[in-house]
Every structure is written in structure tokens, then in C-alpha cells.
From Swiss-Prot:
An annotated GO BP: embryo sac cellularization
Keywords, comma-separated and alphabetical: ATP-binding, Cell cycle, Cell division, Coiled coil, Cytoplasm, Cytoskeleton, Microtubule, Motor protein, Nucleotide-binding
Record-given protein name: Kinesin-like protein KIN-7B
Main location group: cytoplasm
Summary of the tissues where the protein is detected: Expressed in roots, stems, flowers, pollen mother cells and embryos.
Taxonomic lineage: Eukaryota, Viridiplantae, Streptophyta, Embryophyta, Tracheophyta
Gene3D superfamilies: Kinesin motor domain
Length: 938
């Protein structure tokens, strides 16, 4: 004999242990099985078709006659084919539920289905099997004694009738606070044996109301309930538990029917209406219970059937439902309703517990002992407990003191580390101002952020990274984030600066050449060298002439740019400036030698006026003191030259001398007195000293200016070389060659994690800056974590970061300075976002079907009744930046509304925001960042 099958584990949700005098509570869903009968003789006579099939023992499929429609599948705990016997149906799902009544748990088994589907036939076989198994279990369990009682009733036209004693007439239903709903004056017979029980069940079947219809010769016209009350107890009483008591309900429901199929009239029509009404109430109760909403009202009292079975529907009982169906195509609608009822019943949860009967005397004694124990503990607390409490308090105090000492030590270490960090930062600042100036200039030139505003990598903790690692990360980020087009543009700009420096050097040489040729400063050889050098620099400028308009190529012209840079003589200008330096040194030395010759003294005597002055040389002063010079004239002068310039300021250096001074000199020379000769010699010495100081200052200023030009050219050359290295490394990354930084960083950085972090930050900044939701959808749907998306993610993040900072600065600025601009910026952006949502709301009806709209309204908690449901639905999109599922669903819905999903062509990421916008839908708010730029007047 087969053992009793167990309930599937999926049906049992939670189980609580036994209490000393309590019961075991088990939450379990209703067990639902489906039995399909074969075609009967009426259906064969009509040549009816079979519309259902069972591919496996848990699935039933509707074979739709229309081949265009997909078959409909239903899944249950167990499905029985027409060839299965009733014993298999019982053992497959009902046996375990029925035998649980022997262990003290209430149980209910009932059959549900349309008329003539085989309910009564199935329940007769199940009842016989239940009686057989009960007495078999009693025979095997000798240590317990069992007492069985049986009662039977039927509900006919909403009237309760006792099947064991029909003379009692209609019975009333009463509510008992402990037992629930009971039937007044219902006869309950004590079962003496198995044959006695079978005899009583046969009496109930004979007393039941049966009638003939067009679909069934013996159609049940009432609901029949046979109740077995099982009382079991141990033969040797142990503990306070004396016995178990449970009820087993065997319910044979009347079948639902349609009047046009049964051809019912008169009494049969009245019976059918009562049957359908009670079954409708049962279906409503099942659906209310399966919804899971505890606040919903469950209409148990609308029908006497549901009122009697209330304990079995969501209450203290285990329940098994056998749904019987017909395979005929003519009954397909009724079959679908039966399966729909079964699907709802699968979700109903019962809370079954073991019903234990406790002896009142023993229970009272047990409780008195427990109370006495508690009172004794309250009166005289044990000393051991107080000792334990004291030791526990001492232990806690020691732990607190230990933690305080650890906190002090940690604070001391933190202060030491902070002081060391401050010292290191100050040393780096001093060192960076002197030695790292070229690198900082390159960083400023490239305009790439290398501070904390860049996105940190979560793969390596910042506390463990050294300064060298951070420098490597910064270089790596600048290389990977640098666009080749931007690098080429920066190289061209550096060449433009080099051209300007060449022009300034040309001006310096031109001025030196003019002074040498016009005033004979130095020898003829030096003048020729200066002229030759000037012509060479001009030739070099002609060969390296750049157009005013910088043409920026794409990534494919990088090799041509590198070849052009390598073919150029980058250090040519530096060499020319070195020649200028040598020439100036030679001029200084020649000036010092010529100063000692008699010809020089004679020349000075003949020339009474200075040929030129520092204050009256506008070209030289503009060159030395111009804004392009790194050093000003006052910074290069020594104290002596300042005195000379101050003394020579009131002297006039015109083309003709003043007549008063000339006449005075002639008078003094004619008189020939020693006083006039002495004054003349003093004037000549003073003039010689002024001339010498002025010439030395001019040469010194030019020399310092040329030195500054050399330094700037060296810096520009360093910047160009660094940019070329960046271009080369970008090309190496394209061809797949991994450099040292790539090998170290790729092992430390996990791009998918970094992508998710960046996308979360971007979504939050979208929300804070009131960015267009269509722009958000475009970006979210296009960039999904590909390694090539890194540059786009960084650009978007920098845009949004700048926009947030810009709006914050406008918000913190003085209203007197800005007027209404901050409010207008935010108001314009919010107004544009509102217009965008209104536009999307207009497209809901055209882009979404009616069923899809209703499903979305239900999913997004849009009230079923109300105005502007479309606008309410759109206003809920893109409102929660912290919920990634909300963001993803919002993006999918907006993509459907705007038509991103309709286009079959592949969208290139380089054409972002150009391919998505259709010509007919070009609005100001659909221009993405262009609208933001116009809004901020950028």
C-alpha cells in the first residue's frame, strides 16, 4: 500500500513551533488540482471537438481553432487527464489534506465546476477512499483512541436541510465565538464502524435533491456537505494535552449552468438561479482573498455556503479544491471560468493549526505552578543574578575605558598625520611654484581638471594611494580624456604663441640694428652680424607662417600632424635667440674697449648732446615694458641706473641745442678763464657718464628681455613635446598597445563599476539642473557602459558639474548685482520642462494603445477616475533619481512616446542629439545642451 503523499513544499510558507499548551500554526495555500473528463455520449453525438490537452501533469493548454492566436496555458499543482482514475485524483492531492484531520487539523475537500463535468462522480470516489484510509490509520495507530461523529446537510435554494433527519425542516445558522458558524439542531451521529459510516453516507446521497436537465440526467440541485468530526486521544495520558479534535468537510457543490444550455424553466430555472448566485459569492470570496489586500471586505455572509465554509476559506483549515472541466469545444467558455476560479484559489492562504483539547484540571494546575514560581522569584531574587549584573557592569566599564583610550590614541595619530600632511602640502606648493611651472602651464593649457572634481575610482582606496600613484592617475585621466582634435588645436595655439615670440625677437634685433647703424655703437663686424641675424629670423618667420584661422582635423590627421611637427626645426628660434645673446655680449665688450680709446673721447667732445635717451626711445620702451615681456623695465634696473634716469629726465634731447646754452659756452670759450675751462670739463664728464649709463641700461634691458624670450620659447617647446607625446599615446591606445600606465590602471579600475557610479551622478545632476527629460532619455538609451562611452560620460558629467556650479554661483550672488537673472534662469528651465511634459502627454494616445495605457496608469498609481490622467502619468516620469528601476522605466516610456524605438537604423554615438530629433518635432527644449547654452547666454 502506498504511503500518504505529502503536500508540496511550495505550498507551505511558515511554521511555528509548539507551545507548552498551545498549537502549531501553519500558513499554507489552498491545494488546487484539475480533472478533465472524457467526452460523454451527448458530445459524441454532436461531433463535438476536444479543445483542451494536458502536455504534462501540471499544465493544461487550450487549443485555439484560430491558428493565428497563440495557445493559452494554465498551470496548477496537479492536472489529471481523462484517462486517470478517481483513486489517482485522490492520492495526487486530496489524501494528505484528508489525513491531516487525524492529527488535529481541520480539513476541507470540495469539487467545483460546471454542470455535467463530473463533480459528484469524483466526490463519491474521494469519500470512499477517505473512509478507507481513516479506518486503516485507526487500525495501525493502536496507542490512540478515536471517536468519529458524522453530520450531513444540503443547501437547497438557500435553505439548510439536515440530510440525516429531514423532519427538522429548515435550519438556522448561528455564530459561536469559539467554534465559528454552527448549524442549529443539526443531527450528529456517532460512528460505530466503517460499515456504519458508509451506510450513513449512502443515506445522505439518497436524500439529496437531484433533477434532470438537458445536459445531465441526474443533475445535483443543491450543495451537499458531509462533516466528519474526529476526536483522538492517547490511551495513556501524559502531560496537559489530552486529545486532538478536528473536522473533515467533504463538499459536493452543484454545478454552474446556463439557462439556454439546460433549457430550464419553472422550478429548474429557480434552482439554477440560486446555485449560480451562491457560486458567484464563492468566486467573489476567493478573489478577495487572493488579492492579498487585508483591508478589503470579504462577503462571507452573502451566501449560506460561504458562511458555513468560512473557516475553510482563509481560516483555520487545510483546503483542497478539485476543479472538474469538460474538454468539449462547446463548453469552452464555462471551462475558462472554472480555470480562472482555480487560478485565484491558488493564491488564497489558510492559517491551519492543531486543535488540542486540554484537561481543565491539569491546565489549571500547570498555570498555578507557573504563577507560584514567578511570585517566588519576585519575592527573593537570587544573589547570583545580582553578582552577574555587577560583573557585567564592571566588564562594560572596562570596555568603555579601553575604547576611550583607543579613541585618544587614534586622535593623536590623526593629528600627527594631519600635521605631516600640511607640511608636505606646503613643501609641494613651494616646490611646484619653482620647479613644476611647465607642467602646471601644460595643465592650464589643456584645460583638463586634475583636482578632486574628477571622478574618483572606487577600485583603489584613496587613503592607500601615494602621491606618485595619484600623479599617475592624473596623467592617465588627462591622456584618456583628451580628444585628439583638442590636442591638435592646442599644438596650433602653441605655434601661434611661438610666432608672436619670434616677432618680438625680430623687433628687438631691429631696434639693436637701428641703434648700431645710426649711432655707430660697436664695430662694423658686429653691425653686419646683427643685420645677418635679422634677415635669417625674417626668413624663418616666412617659412613658418601660419594662417590666422586654425583648421582642426579629425582623429585620422594625427599622423600628419606628428610628421609635420617632427619635420620642423622647433629649436630654430631658440638658436637664433642664442645668437642674439652672443651679439649683445660682443657689443658690450666692444663698447667697453671703445670707451678707453682717444677717438671715443674726441667723438664725445664733438657731440655735445646725447644721440638718444631711454626716456625718448618709444620703440625700446614699448618693447621692454610691453605686456608681452615677462620682466618689466623697473625690475631690471639697478639703483645707479635709476639715479641716472632721474637726473637725466629734465635734460632736453632735441635736434638743435638751446640758444642760451650755446651763447654761454661761446662767451666762456672767448674769455678763456680757468673757471669756464673747469665748468666745461665738468659738463663733458657728466655727459660722458650719462651716455655710458644710458647705453649700458639699454643693452642690459635688451639682454634681460632676450633671456626672458629664451625661457618662454623653452617652455613652449616643452608644452609642444608633451602634447606630441599625448597624441602618440592616444594612437598607441587605438592600435591596442598597452603602456605602463594602462597596465597598472586597468588592473585597478573596473569600468562597469565606474560607469554605474558616473551614471548615477549624471542622473542626479539632471534632476538638480532641470535638464530636458528627452535629453536624459537619449543619453540613457544610447550610452549603456561600452568602454568607448567613457569620453561621452566624462563630457556630460563635466557639463552638468559646471552647470550646477554656475547656477549655485548665481543663487549665491547679490541680488543687487544680478537683478532677476537667477530667477529667470531657473524659471525658464522649469517652464521648458513643463512644456516638454505637456508635449509628451499629447503623444500618449497616439503612441500607446488603450490596454497599454491602462496598464501603465495602474502601474504608476494614476487614479482610475479623474481629469488629465495623461498629464498625471507624464508628471510621474523622471522624478526619482535615486531609484534606478524608476529611471529605466521612465526612459523606456519616453523613448516610445518620442519614437526612439521606432527607427530601425543604427544610431551613431558621434551624432548624439542629431539623429533622434525628427524634423517635425524640433522644439527649443529638444535641442539638448543647445537650449541650456542659450538659456545661460553662453
Amino acid at each position: 500500500m502506498m504511503g500518504p503523499p505529502r503536500t508540496p513544499l511550495s505550498k507551505i510558507d511558515k511554521s511555528n513551533p509548539y507551545t507548552p499548551c498551545g498549537s502549531k500554526v501553519t500558513e499554507e495555500k489552498i491545494l488546487v488540482t484539475v480533472r478533465m473528463r472524457p467526452l460523454n455520449w451527448r458530445e459524441h453525438a454532436k461531433y463535438d471537438l476536444i479543445a483542451w490537452e494536458c502536455p504534462d501533469d501540471e499544465t493544461i493548454v487550450f487549443k485555439n481553432p484560430n491558428p493565428d492566436k497563440a495557445p493559452t496555458k494554465y498551470s496548477f499543482d496537479k492536472v489529471f487527464e481523462p484517462t486517470c482514475a478517481t483513486q489517482e485524483v485522490y492520492e495526487g492531492g486530496s489524501r494528505d489534506v484528508a489525513l491531516s484531520a487525524l492529527a488535529g487539523t481541520n480539513a476541507t475537500i470540495f469539487a467545483y465546476g460546471q454542470t455535467s463535468s463530473g463533480k459528484t462522480f469524483t466526490m463519491r470516489g474521494v469519500t470512499e477512499s477517505v473512509v478507507k484510509d481513516i479506518y486503516e490509520h485507526i487500525r495501525k495507530t493502536q496507542e490512540r483512541s478515536f471517536v468519529l461523529k458524522v453530520s450531513a446537510l444540503e443547501i437547497y435554494n438557500e435553505t439548510v436541510v439536515d440530510l440525516l433527519n429531514r423532519d427538522t425542516g429548515p435550519l438556522r445558522l448561528l455564530d459561536d465565538p469559539e467554534k465559528g458558524t454552527i448549524v442549529e439542531n443539526l443531527v450528529e451521529e456517532v460512528v460505530e464502524s466503517r460499515q456504519h459510516l458508509q451506510h450513513l453516507i449512502s443515506i445522505c446521497e439518497d436524500q439529496r435533491q437531484v433533477g434532470e436537465t438537458a445536459l445531465n440526467d441526474k443533475s445535483s440541485r443543491s450543495h451537499q456537505i458531509i462533516r466528519l468530526t474526529i476526536h483522538s486521544s492517547l490511551r495513556e495520558i501524559a502531560g496537559c494535552v489530552q486529545s486532538f479534535m478536528a473536522t473533515l468537510n467533504l463538499v459536493d457543490l452543484a454545478g454552474s449552468e446556463r439557462a439556454f444550455q439546460t433549457n430550464a424553466d419553472g422550478l429548474r430555472l429557480k434552482e439554477g438561479s440560486h446555485i449560480n448566485r451562491s457560486l458567484l459569492t464563492l468566486t467573489t470570496v476567493i478573489r478577495k482573498l487572493s488579492s492579498g489586500r487585508k483591508r478589503d471586505h470579504v462577503p462571507y455572509r452573502d451566501s449560506k455556503l460561504t458562511r458555513i465554509l468560512q473557516n475553510s476559506l482563509g481560516g483555520n483549515a487545510r483546503t483542497a479544491i478539485i476543479c472538474t472541466i469538460s474538454p468539449a469545444l462547446s463548453h469552452v467558455e464555462q471551462t475558462k471560468k472554472t480555470l480562472s476560479f482555480a487560478m485565484s484559489a491558488k493564491e488564497v492562504t489558510n492559517c491551519a493549526k492543531v486543535n488540542m483539547v486540554v484537561s481543565e484540571k491539569k491546565l489549571l494546575k500547570h498555570l498555578q505552578q507557573k504563577v507560584a514560581k514567578l511570585e517566588s522569584e519576585l519575592r527573593s531574587p537570587e544573589p547570583s543574578s545580582s553578582t552577574c549584573l555587577k560583573s557585567l557592569l564592571i566588564e562594560k566599564e572596562m570596555k568603555i575605558q579601553q575604547m576611550e583610550s583607543e579613541m585618544k590614541e587614534l586622535k593623536r595619530q590623526r593629528d600627527i598625520a594631519q600635521s605631516e600632511l600640511d607640511l608636505e602640502r606646503k613643501a609641494k606648493e613651494r616646490k611646484g611654484s619653482s620647479e613644476c611651472e611647465p607642467f602646471s602651464q601644460v595643465a592650464r593649457c589643456l584645460s583638463y581638471h586634475t583636482k578632486e572634481e574628477s571622478i574618483p575610482s572606487k577600485s583603489v582606496p584613496s587613503s592607500r594611494r601615494t602621491a606618485r600613484d595619484r600623479r599617475k592617475d592624473n596623467v592617465r585621466q588627462s591622456l584618456t580624456s583628451a580628444d585628439p582634435t583638442a590636442l591638435v588645436q592646442e599644438i596650433r595655439l602653441l605655434e601661434k604663441h611661438q610666432k608672436k615670440l619670434g616677432e618680438e625677437a625680430n623687433q628687438a634685433l631691429d631696434l639693436i640694428h637701428k641703434e648700431v647703424t645710426s649711432h655707430k655703437l660697436g664695430d662694423q663686424q658686429a653691425a653686419e652680424k646683427v643685420a645677418k641675424m635679422l634677415s635669417e629670423i625674417r626668413d624663418m618667420q616666412k617659412s613658418n607662417l601660419l594662417t590666422e584661422e586654425i583648421v582642426v582635423g579629425d582623429k585620422a590627421n594625427l599622423k600628419e600632424e606628428i610628421n609635420r611637427l617632427n619635420s620642423q626645426e622647433i629649436a630654430a628660434l631658440e638658436k637664433k635667440l642664442e645668437c642674439v645673446q652672443n651679439t649683445i655680449d660682443m657689443l658690450v665688450s666692444s663698447f667697453q674697449t671703445d670707451e678707453q680709446t682717444p677717438d671715443f673721447r674726441t667723438q664725445v667732445k664733438k657731440k655735445r648732446l646725447l644721440p638718444f635717451g631711454l626716456s625718448n626711445s618709444p620703440n625700446l620702451q614699448h618693447m621692454i615694458r610691453g605686456p608681452c615681456s615677462p620682466l618689466s623695465g623697473t625690475e631690471n634696473k639697478d639703483p645707479e641706473s635709476n639715479v641716472v634716469s632721474a637726473n637725466s629726465a629734465p635734460v632736453s634731447f632735441g635736434a638743435t641745442p638751446p640758444k642760451r646754452d650755446d651763447n654761454r659756452c661761446r662767451t666762456q670759450s672767448r674769455e678763456g678763464t680757468p673757471v669756464s675751462r673747469q665748468a666745461n670739463s665738468v659738463d663733458i664728464k657728466r655727459m660722458n657718464r650719462m651716455y655710458k649709463n644710458a647705453a649700458e641700461e639699454n643693452i642690459r634691458n635688451i639682454k634681460s628681455y632676450v633671456t626672458g624670450l629664451k625661457e618662454r620659447v623653452a617652455k613652449l617647446q616643452y608644452q609642444k613635446q608633451l602634447l606630441v607625446c599625448q597624441v602618440l599615446e592616444l594612437e598607441a591606445n587605438e592600435t591596442g598597445a598597452a603602456s605602463e600606465y594602462d597596465a597598472t590602471d586597468e588592473s585597478q579600475m573596473d569600468w562597469p563599476l565606474c560607469f554605474e557610479e558616473q551614471r548615477k551622478q549624471i542622473i542626479m545632476l539632471w534632476h538638480l539642473c532641470h535638464i530636458s527629460i528627452i535629453h536624459r532619455t537619449q543619453f540613457y538609451m544610447l550610452f549603456k557602459g561600452d568602454p568607448a562611452d567613457q569620453i561621452y560620460m566624462e563630457v556630460e558629467l563635466r557639463r552638468l558639474t559646471w552647470l550646477e556650479q554656475h547656477l549655485a554661483e548665481l543663487g549665491n550672488a547679490s541680488p543687487a548685482l544680478l537683478g532677476d537673472e537667477p530667477a529667470s534662469y531657473v524659471a525658464s528651465s522649469i517652464r521648458a520642462l513643463k512644456q516638454e511634459r505637456e508635449y509628451l502627454a499629447k503623444r500618449v494616445n497616439t503612441k500607446l494603445g488603450a490596454e497599454e495605457r491602462e496598464m501603465l496608469y495602474l502601474k504608476w498609481d494614476v487614479p482610475p477616475v479623474g481629469k488629465q490622467r495623461r498629464q498625471q502619468f507624464i508628471n510621474k516620469l523622471w522624478t526619482d533619481p535615486h531609484n534606478m528601476q524608476h529611471v529605466r522605466e521612465s526612459a523606456e516610456i519616453v523613448a516610445k512616446l518620442v519614437g526612439f524605438c521606432d527607427s530601425g537604423e543604427t544610431i551613431r554615438k558621434e551624432m548624439f542629439e542629431l539623429n533622434f530629433a525628427s524634423p517635425s518635432d524640433k522644439k527649443t527644449w529638444m535641442m539638448g545642451w543647445n537650449f541650456i547654452s542659450n538659456l545661460l547666454h553662453l
